[in-house]
Amino acid sequence: MLSLFDTFSARRQENITKSAGGAVIPGQKNTVSIFALGPSITDDNDKMTLALLFLSHSLDNEKQHAQRAGFLVSLLSMAYANPELYLTSNGSNADVKYVIYMIEKDPGRQKYGGLVVKTREMVYEKTTDWMFGSDLEYDQDNMLQNGRSTSTIEDLVHTFGYPSCLGALIIQVWIILVKAITSISGLRKGFFTRLEAFRQDGTVKSSLVLSGDAVEQIGSIMRSQQSLVTLMVETLITMNTGRNDLTTIEKNIQIVGNYIRDAGLASFFNTIRYGIETRMAALTLSTLRPDINRLKALIELYLSKGPRAPFICILRDPVHGEFAPGNYPALWSYAMGVAVVQNKAMQQYVTGRSYLDIEMFQLGQAVARDAESQMSSILEDELGVTQEAKQSLKKHMKNISSSDTTFHKPTGGSAIEMAIDEEAEQPESRGDQDQGNEPQSSIVPYAWADETRSDTQTESVTEIESIKTEQRNIRDRLNKRLNEKRKQSDPKSTNIANDTNQTEIDDLFSAFGNN
């Protein structure tokens, strides 16, 4: 009977996700124009000019989002010698039908430098005027951070080569995808953070860095046009990383792909890592048994998705909501308790959710600090650990854990996914609260270890109560001493904070450690 209950969740999920048969009825599709470069365009400067033109059209608010996404697809397909084959392999989609037009150069034409839009059968004059004669709202200077004020297209192509310059634009579109779907508020900051690595290794030149506004516009297109996201994901799936002939652009796409994989599934994988893989005795609790069974069913569901499993959130797979931590709250709360002790970086992770089980959260912290729970008997036998070494290790672990016996409090709120995604707060922008006629405190605001603030300038009751009594007393004493010094100092002095002596600084650092 118990085994039947254990497998019920998995069988139930299987019945929900599997097909019941029946005819597949096609839905409505958008027809989207894709532009590819024909064999008559051989000049690298012309190719780079067209790449920037595609990007400009994709940022034109006068066009529909579907067509703006089409211009981004046109840009991405320029990385391949055969754009038609690329779209055939990766562009199959239930929402759009791609119509490919070729851009050729006709020596007999003077207008638009001889560039013309055509197919094998005919020339499209109106499309040519629409493509090259449009008064774009977004010109090529505004969409780049530096506006190409120091370098022309010819200079960049001559110095770095066309493939390198094209790759700089394409890789930035891929970086935008990392945050465009799963973390809208952190898009701009996340983009420039990840871009920095590509700037340092020379992949992206400073003259070709997209502006912040352009980044947000492209992110908006990705959110509204799932067909574009699907194409990019299929590109990652079908790209054979085992090949020895990957181009530099393809290698860089794979690097960015590592950030895209499993995006939006952080809670699921953190629960497995800190809740299950640590294999502590708390897993035997009956309270956690239902959530463990639920997690087992989710793991089987994840594996059943095959190569598309890491992208279920990016692709908005109907089952991606099943992986939310609210579906296994007790186990997630326990895992987060273990995480904030074992990994200091996890203390920035937002755990203050409505479904947080505070008792399991504290239990996770308690067992993570316990030396006995952290030792694996299986590894002890495999490594041949002696009893003396085992006792010595226990002693060291107890000494370390005894220095911090207080429980970490939940951080953040339910509306924020990751605290690290928020904009860094500038200390000078924050002033002390109104203190009436009392002099303003000179203590640096960010010196208080337990004080946190949200970007909306609000503080919860929990955050205010988290300031320890000892810290309050130290702050009052330091403020009193500083105020006494103000009264004794020269009235003409305009910068009293610079007169703080070394004793006061030592007091502050001794009170808060090395924060």
Swiss-Prot record:
Residues 424-515 are annotated as: Disordered. Residues 404-515 are annotated as: Ntail. It is found in: Virion; Host cytoplasm. GO terms for cellular component: helical viral capsid; host cell cytoplasm; ribonucleoprotein complex; viral nucleocapsid. RNA binds at residues 179, 189, 194, 259, 349, 353. Its main location: virion. Keywords: Capsid protein, Helical capsid protein, Host cytoplasm, Ribonucleoprotein, RNA-binding, Viral nucleoprotein, Virion. Residues 434-443, 491-503 have a biased composition (Polar residues). It holds the Pfam family Paramyxo_ncap. Residues 457-466 are annotated as: Interaction with the phosphoprotein. Residues 465-490 have a biased composition (Basic and acidic residues). Residues 1-403 are annotated as: Ncore. One of its GO terms (molecular function) is RNA binding. Ncore is globular and carries regions required for self-assembly and RNA-binding. Ntail is an intrinsically disordered monomeric domain in the C-terminus. Forms the helical nucleocapsid (NC) in a ratio of 1 N per 6 ribonucleotides, protecting the genome from nucleases. The encapsidated genomic RNA serves as template for transcription and replication; encapsidation by N is coupled to RNA synthesis. Forms the encapsidation complex with the phosphoprotein protein P. Before encapsidation, the newly synthesized free N protein, so-called N0, is chaperoned by P. Homomultimer; forms the nucleocapsid. Binds to the viral genomic RNA. N0 interacts with the phosphoprotein (via N-terminus); this interaction allows P to chaperon N0 to avoid N polymerization before encapsidation. Interacts as N-RNA template with the phosphoprotein (via C-terminus); this interaction positions the polymerase on the template. Belongs to the paramyxoviruses nucleocapsid family. This is Nucleoprotein. It comes from Bovine parainfluenza 3 virus.
